[in-house]
Amino acid sequence: MEPSQSINLIILGLIVVMHAGVLALRLGISLARI
């Protein structure tokens, strides 16, 4: 595997984790408001 490929995978993983965190926060806020 080339180093650039692993770096791209790490960036993709970080983006996925960030999106999951944002979705979880939005769900928690919407549930707390109810």
Curated annotation (Swiss-Prot):
GO terms for cellular component: photosystem I; plasma membrane-derived thylakoid membrane. The keyword Transmembrane helix applies. One of its GO terms (biological process) is photosynthesis. The keyword Nucleotide-binding does not apply. It is a single-pass membrane protein. The chain crosses the membrane at residues 9-29. Signal peptide: none annotated. InterPro entries: PSI_PsaM (IPR010010). Keywords: Membrane, Photosynthesis, Photosystem I, Thylakoid, Transmembrane, Transmembrane helix. It is found in: Cellular thylakoid membrane. Belongs to the PsaM family. This is Photosystem I reaction center subunit XII. The gene is psaM.
